[in-house]
Amino acid sequence: MASNPNAVEQEILQAVNSAQTTDKRKAHEQSLAYLPVEEERGVNVVGSKMKPRYIALTCDDVTRIFYIHRLKVNDKGGMTVVKSWPLFELQNITVINDHDVTMTINKPHLLRTQDTSARDRFVFSVAKNYMYYMGRPLSVTTTDGRKVDWAYRNSFADNKPNLYPAKSLAIPKARSSLPENSSEQVSSSFNSRVAHNRNFSDGPIVTNLETDQPRIEKKLTIDSSRSAKKKLSVEKERRFSDNKPSSNVSRGTPSSAHSDVIEISSSSAIARTSGDRKDDVLFDTSTQRRDNQTREMFIQEQAQLFPSKPSLRKTTRREQAPSFNSGTSSSERGKNSISGSYEKNTALALEAGKYNMSQKDVKLSSSLESNTFASDFSKVDRDATQAALSSSLETPSVLTSSYKPSSSSKVSAKSVSRKPTGAPAIPKLPPKHPSRQPTVRATPSTGKQIEPPNDEPSIGNELLPLFESLRFENRKTTSKPKAKKTLVTSIPTKPHQASVEKVYDLNSKINLKNIPEQSISRLSTLKWNEGTTIKDVLKQTEFSFDGAIISSVENLAEEEIELQNIKSQLQDCALGCESINSTINLFSLELSTALNGVINIEQQPSRR
């Protein structure tokens, strides 16, 4: 190997720049560091197991890409590039001992050096430029997996290698140590956090919006809270025992009793809490006075704006009860909870009474309105209206059924004046059979027919809007009985109609009068025998239909057989085409061999 470092560097640069890159251009690379190493030979190579090589780290001036090159020394002089890798393919470096190191690029490459300091400088340069190029530190470890400290620290300041001066950057330390005053900063920050910590079990901090300072609240200890709970339970039992006789005596007037209880409980609670506030809590009286003034001003403005509307009960209750947000402590909240519960129960009872009274007023007003609105229908029989509503849901054939006339309906004078002068008669449905024709009466004076009366009670004319689809005729009954005339209607006979009628009457309940004219004309054209029925006709049609289907299926089967035959013929044609193709290929091969033989025969005398 060459001993002059500058000469070695020049040879490396010349070899690297003369090598063709992937884009077929001359490289313009600068050498950053190089290391003479001995690399293992292959297993099948006879002779020395190690071969001399150079490992160089370079950077291209144009593309700004870092490379790792492996070079070998030629026998005639100079160097050639054996293998090149971009720096980002380098995975890690493992330091085995003072002489051996492994670089993993897709696979581990064992490199042996005689100069340990040169090896260390090269590894440091690679790690430094890897950090600059990739933005993350390179893994340089020992065989045990421990990090190599000298690969991350600039401990080679006196003997710097040939680094690239333009882009050399300081590598940040992998294990950054804390500054000298770090413990003081940590302790001060911890103390500041502890100073701002607060136990939020008593509730959030209530701040004054004017001064933006937290109000002073006295924290209760666990023992004091337990004693306060015991006192509250004792006072609650005593209050219940004191209030029981007063509530029993004043059952007749519950509202007055509840009001007395409210006044007594609230006054006693305020008296007790006012004595405890001086010792337990220190609060700002100016803010409380200001809140009371604003509340009073709001009540006055409300009274001026709404003079007729009484003041709400909730506002009065809020005025009597002490406000918790204005500076009361948790002990006062517990003491005032009993009086607040009494006030809530009594207020709910009073509001329930008011609601019942308001419901009664609403019922009275609605009843008065209904009386004034429905004064015309006060004399209408309810049973008659219900029967009419039920009859409206039935089929219209009910109207044609015979029944006995009922008594005249009770209708007011106003409803009679609103009765229409006349309405067209309802179209009658045809009966099921000519023998079931109903009897129809006709008056001698007027030739109009009168329908038979209905069994349902008569309906007032004021309910006519409910039966817009059903229209009634003005009925005029006479006191004297008159002779009844039966009118029998019949349909004119057509050819073969009697036989058709017999067939339908035997096998179904269908009436010929309900069948459309087109179907009747179609049936009349058919040739019916005396003993034939619809079932026989259906059987005949089914038999003919089945025969047609069977014939069509047979035709389809025959066509399918023909298609299969055609398919087999096509397959035979394809096989014949393939055989023809193969024979053509054989002929072409024979021709080519024959031509080659002819050409060889012609060339032999020329060579001789």
From Swiss-Prot:
Pfam families: Sec3-PIP2_bind, Sec3_C_2. One of its GO terms (molecular function) is phosphatidylinositol-4,5-bisphosphate binding. Residues 243-262, 322-340, 436-448 have a biased composition (Polar residues). Transmembrane segments: none annotated. One of its GO terms (biological process) is endocytosis. One of its GO terms (cellular component) is division septum. Residues 176-192, 396-420 have a biased composition (Low complexity). InterPro entries: Sec3-PIP2_bind, Sec3_C_2. Signal peptide: none annotated. It comes from the Eukaryota. Residues 175-262, 302-340, 389-461 are annotated as: Disordered. Residues 212-221, 232-242 have a biased composition (Basic and acidic residues). This is Uncharacterized protein C17G8.12.
